[in-house]
A protein has these predicted regions:
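Structural signature of tandem alpha-helical TPR/SEL1-like repeats
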Residues: 2, 28-41, 64-76, 97-101
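TPR-adjacent "capping" and linker segments in tetratricopeptide-repeat scaffold/adaptor proteins
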Residues: 2-18
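Alpha-helical segment of the N-proximal tetratricopeptide repeat
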Residues: 13-45
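Residue-level recognition of tetratricopeptide repeat
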Residues: 24, 58-59, 93
Length: 101
């Protein structure tokens, strides 16, 4: 396999990297239902996959305005990586939105 243009921090397989890339492209094209289904399918195969959890948090929070779900996924990231600043900041943002009536 060719050298990746980034560090594969989570040691994802080539298949996982491809699936993640495809799901992210779906999200960029605003094919949100397909992106959600793809991310959830990846999560079934690898329940603790940080990149998938982060993407689901982003999808639910920013794209679908389902703030409670976004918070749930960012909390799952923080259970594994308590120092993950991105997940902590996003969780804080969406928790504020959850408190608005």
């Amino acid at each position: 396999m060719a050298e990746l243009p980034f560090k594969n921090t989570y040691d994802l397989s080539p298949e996982q990297l491809l699936a993640l890339d495809e799901a992210e492209e779906m999200m960029e094209r605003l094919d949100l239902g397909a992106a959600e289904a793809a991310f959830l399918a990846m999560l079934e195969e690898a329940p603790g996959c940080i990149p998938v959890l982060n993407n689901l948090g982003h999808l639910y929070g920013k794209m679908l305005s389902e703030f409670e779900k976004a918070v749930e996924y960012y909390e799952k990231v923080l259970q594994q990586e308590p120092d993950n600043a991105w997940a902590r900041d996003q969780r804080r943002r969406y928790l504020r939105y959850c408190s608005y009536d």
